[in-house]
């Protein structure tokens, strides 16, 4: 069973992408006040905790940006996209992926998104 999501976890995940509380909330479809409360120690619902945990995965955030990136300011979106793409360009071992590995992952994501 995964540990409870702490206020520090929420803030760490948000800051990992250089997002404001408002930007993080918009990309995940949460209320800004909810993100503030979670970062101040209130426990999120199970559904929101799972959503925030999923946001720790750069590939998940890439999908959020593609779907709802227009909800961010142009500067915030550009900054976050650069961070996400930089995080995605490394594999699980921290090694730089070659273009073929990145292409394969992109194709897999497109297939998964198409099935949703």
Model-derived segments and spans:
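Extended interfacial segments that mediate partner engagement and assembly in macromolecular machines
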Residues: 1-47
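Long C-terminal interaction/binding lobes of large macromolecular proteins
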Residues: 54-116
């Amino acid at each position: 069973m995964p540990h409870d999501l702490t206020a520090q976890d929420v803030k760490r995940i948000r800051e990992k992408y250089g997002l404001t509380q408002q930007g993080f909330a918009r990309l995940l479809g949460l209320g800004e006040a909810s993100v503030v409360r979670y970062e101040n120690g209130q426990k999120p619902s199970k559904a929101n905790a799972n959503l925030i945990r999923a946001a720790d995965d750069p590939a998940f955030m890439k999908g959020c940006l593609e779907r709802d990136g227009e909800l961010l300011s142009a500067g915030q979106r550009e900054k976050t996209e650069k961070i996400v793409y930089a995080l995605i360009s490394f594999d699980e071992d921290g090694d730089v992926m070659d273009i073929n590995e990145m292409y394969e992952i992109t194709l897999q994501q497109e297939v998964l998104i198409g099935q949703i």
